[in-house]
């Protein structure tokens, strides 16, 4: 697909290439992507159904897990329908405002997911380090407040990215986005203007969210491990640590994929563009796909209720 050199004033429609360099095989790439999406939808919907129907799971940890499942459904659904439209039906066009909205949803939902992982780490910290006070500290009201703060933090931090693009840029070098979805820097690079402010703010948001969340989760688990290793009985240590395994797995895969995608994009100039696009797409789809599988396999209560549901 050729890219026009004509400067465009306030374009109403943009074009998503998909995966640059792999246009001829995108229809085949769409098959595993669609399978991952369907499994993610089924797994997270099942998780939400179990948590909602079982009163014994109406605890902070599982409420946060339900929030994570809902976020995963929203995140996967914000990119896959359009991506499959590009891969299978050759519908690359997207309205400019719709593209900005998709960008805002994607980055906001990523921020929400990171915030939920912080909330889950805090819950595990209180449950293990202060078990007798857990029920008094993590009240239903506090859970609602934490959930609201997580959503508002992400939405408010990402909103200026949208405003800066809409208000600062009027002329664009091209209307063709070399990506499979509307990502912040992919849109910013189209502008025929100084994009330094947008780049700086984008990095500020990324490092603010990731920096705070990673620090908080790491400190929480340092305290958790200190408390666990001080327990006198081996069985008690194993039981306490076992309640954290699922969260640790989800936390590691979320941030490892995020950092791998970030550093290959920023510093992997020798890497082919289609590798960048593939990894950035996989980074958004793999967590929604893996999270319900990890919690289903590692959390006894969830596993029991899944078996009970299918047996009945």
Swiss-Prot record:
Q: Name one Pfam family in it.
A: 7tm_4
Q: Which GO terms describe its biological process?
A: sensory perception of smell; signal transduction
Q: Which UniProt keywords apply?
A: Cell membrane, Disulfide bond, G-protein coupled receptor, Glycoprotein, Membrane, Olfaction, Receptor, Sensory transduction, Transducer, Transmembrane, Transmembrane helix
| Stored InterPro entries | GPCR_Rhodpsn, GPCR_Rhodpsn_7TM, Olfact_rcpt, OR51/52/56-like
What is the disulfide pattern of this chain? 99-182
Question: Which residues are glycosylated according to the annotation?
Answer: 5
Q: Where in the cell is it found?
A: Cell membrane
Q: Which GO terms describe its cellular component?
A: plasma membrane
SUPFAM superfamilies for this protein = Family A G protein-coupled receptor-like
Listed GO molecular functions?
Answer: G protein-coupled receptor activity; olfactory receptor activity; transmembrane signaling receptor activity
Cytoplasmic topology: which positions?
49-56, 123-141, 221-240, 298-312
Which regions span the lipid bilayer?
28-48, 57-77, 102-122, 142-162, 200-220, 241-261, 277-297
The source's superkingdom equals: Eukaryota
Which sequence ranges are listed under topological domain Extracellular?
1-27, 78-101, 163-199, 262-276
The way this protein sits in the membrane is described as: Multi-pass membrane protein
Q: Which PANTHER family match?
A: OLFACTORY RECEPTOR 52A1, OLFACTORY RECEPTOR 56B1-RELATED
Protein's job: Odorant receptor.
Q: Which family does it belong to?
A: Belongs to the G-protein coupled receptor 1 family.
Q: What is this protein called?
A: Olfactory receptor 52A1
Q: Which species is the source of this protein?
A: Homo sapiens (Human)
